[in-house]
Amino acid sequence: MATLAEKNQRAALDAIIVNIFSTYLYKINNVITNIYMKKIKNRIFVDKKINSNDQIILDADQIHYLKSVLRTKKNDYVSVFNRELLFMTKVIDITKKTCELEIIDHKKIESEDHNITLFFSPIKRTPLEIMIQKCSEIGISIFQPVIMERTNMKNVNFERLRLIAVEACEQSNRNKIPEINKPISFATMINDNSLAGYLYCSLDNNEEKIKNMKLTKNEAIGIIIGPEGDFSAKEYESLKSKKKSIGVTLGPNILKSETAAITATSIIMDKIYNA
């Protein structure tokens, strides 16, 4: 017969084996969940707290989007995410007015490695919406409108811009919804030194090229885009004297504000993740 010491050793060994098996099973389950969640094309953002045992209730617009736009059917899978968790759900039933989702699994949304703030002058509605949409897809963390000397679009529908940002994140498989702040003055932006560096886009082709700069994703970066008609001479002087501020060129061509924002964001994201 086994002694008490041998029994204790065997029990301890069994506990270690169970712990190792449970750990690997948990990791495998996470990998499988991540793979399936990435493959699910139907994605909906719900701006409220959801518990894993809750019933997810969608509003009329979201149901219409799932059924009529994405053509979601019974037994299809839908990714539902809020600001904290990502849920893999299965459609139990869907009609024009109702949608019943069963929660299959969930995971915590990890914070993004980068932090990029886009400072921009509000422009006309259509190009502004394009800028918000594309920069949300690419990865802007915070949109900060700035009232500049040549700003000619001061009335902005921020609720619509937030909706556009949400839809862009749903489409692009991004789980972090960017913030869209209320406008600040140019002077307030100049006096802000909370970020590691500020890159203002200049029409001077002799300025620094972003691709030649040393940028890392663990540093908070600000991109400053001028209004239609560019920064004024006085604003250029303020930008040049601003702490941690560097002028950058986006090439020899004169880009529209929304094009400059999208281009600068793309170059910086590629630089910090792929360089």
Summary of predicted features, one role per range:
Residues 2-18:
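Short amphipathic, helix-prone segments within low-complexity/disordered or flexible regions
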Residues 233-275:
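Structured adenosyl-cofactor binding patch, chiefly the S-adenosyl-L-methionine
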Residues 110-197:
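RNA substrate-binding interface of SAM-dependent RNA methyltransferases
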Residues 198-237, 246-248:
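Active-site/ligand-binding-proximal alpha/beta "capping" segment
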Residues 56-57, 113-117, 220-222, 238, ...:
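Glycine/charged-rich beta-loop-alpha catalytic/anionic-binding loops adjacent to active sites
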Residues 3-5, 20-108:
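N-terminal positively charged helical leader segments and presequences
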